């Protein structure tokens, strides 16, 4: 540092008074960056020089100044030569010398930042320099201001989110808020809030966080006339206030009709408010400053009380409350097995309401036990009551049974039904469906064990063949036989159901078929001509021939007759069973009918023969000379020596056999054709049932 003598200082001040003012000039800089150098740089700067550089950058920027070279005269507190950096109202730095000391400072690596868009840099040199000083080389640039981080003025900072960009910034708000017109304050759209429930909770926006600024909120509680709303402030109550002026900034106000409560602010919650009306408006206002947490209130409505209710016998009331008031509703229901009875109308539940005048909308109904009513009748069956006095109410029990021994219950169900809580008779398996009574097949009351074996076609005992049917013309003349299947079907030979065909032209036309009105079915028949009280004369509904029936060869010689009404099953009328398995050679079968005995005359009563089943090859050999063919749908029976056979008038009749294990009779065949009735080596040929069983069941639906 240069030594300053008293005399030099005195001379300096004297010269300053004697010499004219130092020449000075100003340079205006408006670029975003630039360079500033002392006069004459890099040579020595002149004495008595003063230059000012005024740097201005756009809004949103500040100025950064740094020095690459600095070499000025040293002086105490930079009294001689110096560089001064300042703004309009603030000196940012003063530099001089070659290195920093206790009394002078050089910029070194220091960066000078302006707080705003303006910076002034002034260089000044005094009247003399004893040494050579090279001055300075400085650079400046505009740098972006991060307003989001550096904004100190609360009134200009963003409420929620601040987004900086080069040269400026903008504000945005959280979800549910909108930006105020000042572009920094976030407010909520909180007007028009409507509450119509009888109880509820209302809070300031974002409670318990600070509520938004510059907001005008309104909340309306609007209930049905007859209610009275009460308000209760809860938990935190924190609204900006003023120590001297009541609620000048933020406040909450309550309006109900002509009454007004408030404004309220501060940290003390208002007392509970009973508005005595059904419609209340709550107003809340906030200004553009403050960080207060807001308020929370609950409301509830009360009305006139209604009298206490007594539930009906065998019933209940829901909900069960100590007190019921206006608009409360209760649901009356009954215990399981009971129904609500109101004004002679039965229903599951009944609802009543407490009215605004304190009266119930209706009287409590009664509970009536469920009645399933008289059980439905069962076809071919009967019903008995298991409960005393033939009760039909809830949990009463009945039992269905079939008319034995002629009918049996399908699937062997118990037949027990209980009156359910829904008012229906219900079975564990069948639910609401009635059981089905199926005809018992192949179990005649009169056992064949009671008579000796029949030879050469002897009269059959009455009732031993209860399935045999007589096909009779309306004049009473019989023409064929048949077998009862199920409750209303008769199986016979197809050739029985049409007129005789011309041997020269054996084509079956529909006009040759018998009409249902051309004949009738007689069940329970024993005598051929005479009638007795056990006979049942039945009308024919329709006839169906086997689709593969050939009238020339008698292949598939089967026909079904559907009855218009079901016969009454008894000791003399019962269906025969369909076969469960194919028949085997040698099995003894019984053929019955009212046909001629050995081509001489018709018998007076039902006749039967017992013969064995014959091997189909043996049967075919017997008919080969006659050019007759025995097909797979046919079965033969008879004795080689002859003497026992079905004859004219027996066509369509049954050939049956007994299953000893099941003690049931099964249909093996239907009398179809033969040659020379009862002659040696002339077996009877029958339509075989087993291979045609599927077709029979498909048409009739009959199951054993």
Curated annotation (Swiss-Prot):
Domain CUB residue range list: 25-143, 190-302
Residues bound to Ca(2+) 1: 73, 81, 126, 128
Domain Sushi: 304-369, 370-439
Description of how activity is regulated: Inhibited by SERPING1 and A2M.
Positions with a binding annotation for Ca(2+) 3: 240, 250, 287, 289
Expression across tissues: Protein of the plasma which is primarily expressed by liver.
Modifications the protein undergoes after translation, according to the UniProt entry: The iron and 2-oxoglutarate dependent 3-hydroxylation of aspartate and asparagine is (R) stereospecific within EGF domains.
Main location: secreted
Inactivation phenotype: Mice are smaller and more vulnerable indicating developmental and growth defects. Mice serum has low C4 and C3 cleavage activity together with low MASP2 activation.
Family per record: Belongs to the peptidase S1 family.
Protein name in UniProt: Mannan-binding lectin serine protease 1
Gene: Masp1
């Amino acid at each position: 540092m240069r030594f300053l003598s008293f005399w030099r200082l005195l001379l300096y001040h004297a010269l300053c008074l004697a010499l004219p003012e130092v020449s000075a000039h100003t340079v205006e800089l408006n670029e975003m960056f630039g360079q500033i150098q002392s006069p004459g740089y890099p040579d020595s700067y002149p004495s008595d020089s003063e230059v000012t550089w005024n740097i201005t950058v756009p809004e949103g920027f500040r100025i950064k100044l740094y020095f690459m070279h600095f070499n000025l005269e040293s002086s105490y507190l930079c009294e001689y030569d110096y560089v001064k950096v300042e703004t309009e109202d603030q000196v940012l730095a003063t530099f001089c010398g070659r290195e920093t000391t206790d009394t002078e400072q050089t910029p070194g690596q220091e960066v000078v930042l302006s707080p705003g868009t303006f910076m002034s840099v002034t260089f000044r040199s005094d009247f003399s320099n004893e040494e050579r000083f090279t001055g300075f080389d400085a650079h400046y640039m505009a740098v972006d201001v991060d307003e989001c981080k550096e904004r100190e003025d609360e009134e200009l900072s963003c409420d929620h989110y601040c987004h900086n960009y080069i040269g400026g910034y903008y504000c945005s708000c959280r979800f549910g808020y909108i930006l105020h017109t000042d572009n920094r304050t976030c407010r909520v759209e909180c007007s028009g809030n409507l509450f119509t429930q009888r109880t509820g909770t209302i809070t300031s926006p974002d409670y318990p966080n600070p509520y938004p600024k510059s907001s005008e909120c309104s909340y309306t509680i609007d209930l049905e006339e007859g209610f009275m709303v009460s308000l209760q402030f809860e938990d935190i109550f924190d609204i900006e206030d003023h120590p001297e002026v009541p609620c000048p900034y933020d406040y909450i106000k309550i309006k109900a009709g002509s009454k007004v409560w408030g404004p309220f602010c501060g940290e003390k919650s208002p007392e509970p408010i009973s508005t005595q009306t059904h419609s209340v408006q709550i107003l809340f206002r906030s200004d553009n400053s403050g960080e207060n947490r807001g308020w929370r209130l609950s409301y509830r409505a009360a009305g006139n009380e209604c009298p206490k209710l007594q539930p009906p016998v065998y019933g209940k009331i829901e909900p069960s409350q100590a007190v019921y008031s206006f608009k409360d509703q209760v649901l009356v229901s009954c215990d399981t097995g009971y129904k609500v009875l109101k004004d002679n109308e039965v229903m599951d539940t009944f609802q009543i309401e407490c009215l605004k005048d304190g009266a119930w909308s209706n009287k409590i109904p009664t509970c009536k036990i469920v009645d399933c009513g008289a059980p439905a009748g069962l076809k071919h069956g009967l019903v008995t009551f298991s409960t005393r006095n033939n009760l039909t109410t809830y949990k009463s029990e009945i039992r269905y049974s079939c008319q034995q021994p002629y009918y049996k219950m399908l699937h062997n169900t118990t037949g027990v039904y209980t009156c359910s809580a829904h008012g229906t008779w219900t079975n564990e398996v069948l639910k609401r469906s009635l059981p089905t009574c199926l005809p018992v097949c192949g179990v005649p009351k009169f056992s064949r064990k009671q008579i000796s074996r029949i030879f050469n076609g002897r009269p059959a005992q009455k009732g031993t063949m209860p399935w045999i049917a007589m096909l009779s013309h309306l004049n009473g003349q019989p023409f064929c036989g048949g077998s009862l299947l199920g409750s209303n079907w008769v199986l016979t030979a197809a050739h029985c159901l049409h007129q005789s065909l011309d041997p020269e032209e054996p084509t079956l036309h529909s006009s040759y078929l018998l009409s249902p009105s051309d004949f009738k079915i007689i069940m329970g028949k024993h005598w051929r001509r005479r009638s007795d009280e056990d006979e049942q004369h039945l009308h024919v509904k329709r006839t169906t021939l086997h689709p593969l029936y050939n009238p020339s060869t008698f292949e598939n010689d089967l026909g079904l007759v559907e009855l218009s009404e079901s016969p009454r099953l008894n000791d003399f009328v019962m269906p025969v069973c369909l076969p469960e398995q194919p028949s085997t050679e040698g099995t003894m079968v019984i053929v019955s009918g009212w046909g001629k005995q050995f081509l001489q005359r018709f018998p007076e009563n039902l006749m039967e023969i017992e013969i064995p089943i014959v091997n189909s090859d043996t049967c075919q050999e017997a008919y080969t000379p006659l050019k007759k063919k025995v097909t797979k749908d046919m079965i033969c029976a008879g004795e080689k020596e002859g003497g026992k056979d079905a004859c004219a008038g027996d066509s369509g009749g049954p050939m049956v056999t007994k299953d000893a294990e099941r003690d049931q009779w099964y249909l093996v065949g239907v009398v179809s054709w033969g040659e020379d009735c009862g002659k040696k080596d002339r077996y009877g040929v029958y339509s075989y049932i087993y291979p045609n069983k599927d077709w029979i069941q498909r048409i009739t639906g009959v199951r054993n």
